[in-house]
């Protein structure tokens, strides 16, 4: 990693850190659950994206994911940080994102923030995952 990612003064991604990434069909977000080198959970990084309509394109090897530049960090303490707003505004100015899509992205972000505050986001299934307990059996490391 070229340089650490810092949110609110705390390193959330760096060399040796890792994440489990979740992509959802027909949703306006994806979620990365981030851990430090020691396996301590740091929080969730959520990209606002155009909804993915097919998760198994190209025989399961690839998917098309369109990042809309607007991101949300949810710390382990449930503190919310909206990220990359400058990139989002610039993308609208350069017409990388239509005004209609930008408006929907902003609405979805606001909805996610409200859901975080009411403890309804991220989805319960994502919150429950404990990687060393839940994922090793799936990888054949029992």
What are these regions (language model features)?
Residues 1-39, 44-62:
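Catalytic core of tubulin tyrosine ligase-like
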Residues 6-9, 21, 63, 76-80, ...:
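Amphipathic, alpha-helical segments enriched in basic
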Residues 16, 60, 95-96, 119:
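Glycine-centered secondary-structure boundary/capping sites
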Residues 26, 40, 78, 86, ...:
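Detector for Asparagine
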Residues 27-33, 42, 66, 103, ...:
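Extended soluble regions of mature proteins
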Residues 41-95:
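Conserved, surface-exposed functional patches that form binding/active-site neighborhoods
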Residues 89-90, 95-107:
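Compact, glycine/acidic-enriched structural inserts
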Residues 108-142:
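Cysteine/selenocysteine-centered motifs that mediate thiol-based redox chemistry or coordinate metal-sulfur cofactors
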């Amino acid at each position: 990693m070229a340089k650490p990612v810092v949110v609110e003064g705390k390193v959330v991604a760096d060399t040796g850190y890792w994440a489990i990434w979740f992509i959802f069909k027909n949703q306006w977000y994806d979620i990365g659950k981030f851990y430090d080198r020691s396996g301590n959970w740091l929080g969730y990084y959520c990209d606002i994206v155009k909804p993915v309509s097919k998760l198994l394109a190209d025989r399961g090897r690839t998917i098309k994911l369109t990042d809309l530049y607007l991101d949300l960090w949810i710390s382990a303490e449930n503190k919310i940080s909206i990220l990359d707003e400058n990139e989002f505004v610039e993308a609208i100015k350069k017409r990388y994102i239509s005004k209609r899509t930008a408006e929907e992205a902003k609405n979805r972000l606001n909805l996610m923030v409200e859901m975080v505050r009411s403890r309804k986001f991220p989805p319960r299934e994502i919150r429950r995952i404990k990687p060393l307990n839940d994922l090793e059996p799936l990888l054949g490391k029992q």
